[in-house]
From Swiss-Prot:
Name of protein: Heat shock protein beta-3
sHSP domain mapped to chain residues: 47-149
Function recorded in the entry: Inhibitor of actin polymerization.
Keyword Magnesium: no
Source species: Bos taurus (Bovine)
SUPFAM superfamilies, per database record: HSP20-like chaperones (SSF49764)
One Pfam family named in its UniProt record: HSP20
Protein keywords: Cytoplasm, Nucleus, Stress response
Family of the protein in this entry: Belongs to the small heat shock protein (HSP20) family.
Location in or out of the cell: Cytoplasm; Nucleus
GO cellular component: cytoplasm; nuclear speck; nucleus
Amino acid sequence: MAKIILRHLIETPVRYEQEFEARGLEDCRLDHALYALPGPTTVDLGKARAAQAPPVDAAEMPPQRGESRFQVLLDVVQFLPEDIIIQTFEGWLLIKAQHGTRMDEHGFISRSFTRQYKLPDGIETKDLSAILCHDGILVVEVKDSAGTK
């Protein structure tokens, strides 16, 4: 039954009716974002189209005060704070986590992951802040240090 529901959500053009009306059929066939399954790297169609044709004044708008210029959200609920390592090296942010073998309801399990992110130009390591939320979400972000008006 879940397979039918998933197929229905993916194959239903009503979800993207406004997107299809504004674009031609051939343009939609060439847009690979329409065929991608939702995931952490899949961009909303409206946002993707806006990114392809940004408004004229978008390049002139600086980030708002307190608005993040760079942000990473990771679900690390299975790891203790001491299991997580955050490093920067030559413009890259490296996040690693690993815990030893533990017993769970199915037997023994051990987990680990490594994520690398390229920091945007002009971002300094000292401006990074990391917060581990109570719900297990790790937030690493760089805030605008120069108070823009």
